Amino acid sequence: MPVRFKGLSEYQRNFLWKKSYLSESYNPSVGQKYSWAGLRSDQLGITKEPGFISKRRVPYHDPQISKYLEWNGTVRKKDTLVPPEPQAFGTPKPQEAEQGEDANQEAVLSLEASRVPKRTRSHSADSRAEGVSDTVEKHQGVTRSHAPVSADVELRPSSKQPLSQSIDPRLDRHLRKKAGLAVVPTNNALRNSEYQRQFVWKTSKESAPVFASNQVFRNKSQIIPQFQGNTFTHETEYKRNFKGLTPVKEPKSREYLKGNSSLEMLTPVKKADEPLDLEVDMASEDSDQSVKKPASWRHQRLGKVNSEYRAKFLSPAQYFYKAGAWTRVKENLSNQVKELREKAESYRKRVQGTHFSRDHLNQIMSDSNCCWDVSSVTSSEGTVSSNIRALDLAGDLTNHRTPQKHPPTKLEERKVASGEQPLKNSTRRLEMPEPAASVRRKLAWDAEESTKEDTQEEPRAEEDGREERGQDKQTCAVELEKPDTQTPKADRLTEGSETSSVSSGKGGRLPTPRLRELGIQRTHHDLTTPAVGGAVLVSPSKVKPPGLEQRRRASSQDGLETLKKDITKKGKPRPMSLLTSPAAGMKTVDPLPLREDCEANVLRFADTLPVSKILDRQPSTPGQLPPCAPPYCHPSSRIQGRLRDPEFQHNMGKPRTNNLQLHPHDAFNDEDADRLSEISARSAVSSLRAFQTLARAQKRKENFWGKP
């Protein structure tokens, strides 16, 4: 709170020493200076004691000069001023009747004339100092013009002067401030604060007209103009660009809609010419609307109003970028809903395991099944050995289930001579219609079975005669004199077994009969491979040297010969166990004897051994190609021991020595030794483990989709 006391008392503020040329030469005495010293308060005109200092702001009146302080004597200019003698203060007595009303009227007039109008107390000392000088001058004027009681006639006409001339400007400013009107601030630099000195008053005088106190109330005079609002209409950019609802379009013919069936170009990025055209169109529409009578808006839709903003600015999902511009995609809900429903149904069927679609049916009934059944002539697996294919799970699974009683023929070299006939048969199948092809295919399976049985009976009869006569070469000659027409069938069967994996060589799904013929499929989830040997083997390389076939053939035949001698001493063999395929009807033999019937199977395969052995010993001629080795895997070439056994890659006992007996020209081949270590035989313990794993795999396959 600022300090308002600046060292000036109330007396010093109200009664200042008037300096003049007389005061310089005048040196008053002490009695003259303090002529009022020792007088009573009633003699000095003080009728009451001063009140306590209060913080409440009260109206302040300038001090009134009593009559006994007024100067009644003449003033001499050259002589010194003599203070007048104070007159005794006399109160009118109530007993005096002659002074009655006249004395009261004179007292009222004298008080009204001597009183200065009320003013508010200022807050700064500077304004108080300025106000003191003004009040002193006014008091002097009042005292000079004031006359004794007899001069009250001169005071009355002065009170009848017009208000606008006699009113004080400070009083007028106070009245306007109380009335709530705009008051122009005083331009006093001393009273301005730091904020007022830096920031000038922004309101102009025209916006806050100055009114007199008698013009506070509004009158009909033309001096004060009527208040007029701002005639300038503010138009925003939104109102200027978007005019609201578009007019209702007239119905158009279908021909017009067909002509404009192309994609509608509604892109947020407009060209430079489009705004000009848009303005011309909007101007023409405005002119048309001014002529026509504005029709009332019809409540056609109660939902979202199709405003101009919604029509021009759509979601980004409804556009696609094409040819350097964003083009609006036309809605085609029917096709989208149909596509989504088809996807949902396919997903549902895939989860439930019933996803047999028309595509699968077309694959089964199509003419291309012959291409899937018969492998390609240029198959890369043709150069792979039979024994390697017997252990290769991924590339040869059906080969172990096909009967092995017919004389073995070399597949790779036989394809070159008889490669034309399988192609002719495949072309015949392609020319047949779908139902005929399916029937013919089934008949072909039966025919193959019958011819295969015939070919199996012939070696049996020849083997019996050979045992009686002991002539091995005659049997070999009979086998070589067989017609070549049976070779394509055998080749076809072997090729089908070679490439009968889960997926065909050309890609696509194998037909259902073919998948059933394959039997149990092996995946990477199985710890062992029981159908072949239980060992986790790497896939063999597809490119083989030409001399590898003869080495595999010799090693397997030697092992079979020694095993035959041991088994024939035990007694009469048991009948063969057959695995019948429900689809193809083809009799197959279990290549891995897991039960007691292993002796019978091995004996039947051993009967065919001398024929193949003689064929191997014969010199190969350029016109006649040597036959292939039997794809059967002899027990001597199986892996012996467990997987973690240190002897896992090595054979033990007598079969091992026979297995390693090679021809003299191939005896010292490192690659052959590596290959033999990969295709090493397994023991009976491993066979039992493989059988248990196979049983678990079959049970898991049967219970995979749940029992019906």
Swiss-Prot record:
Belongs to the MDM1 family. One of its GO terms (cellular component) is centriole. A motif (ST]-E-Y-X(3)-F motif 1) lies at residues 9-15. Residues 79-166, 394-590 are annotated as: Disordered. The modification Phosphoserine is found at S124, S127, S284, S287, S315, S418, S555, S556, S581. It comes from the Eukaryota. This is Nuclear protein MDM1. Microtubule-binding protein that negatively regulates centriole duplication. Binds to and stabilizes microtubules. A motif (ST]-E-Y-X(3)-F motif 3) lies at residues 236-242. Keywords: Coiled coil, Cytoplasm, Cytoskeleton, Microtubule, Nucleus, Phosphoprotein, Repeat. Disulfide bonds: none annotated. A motif (ST]-E-Y-X(3)-F motif 2) lies at residues 193-199.
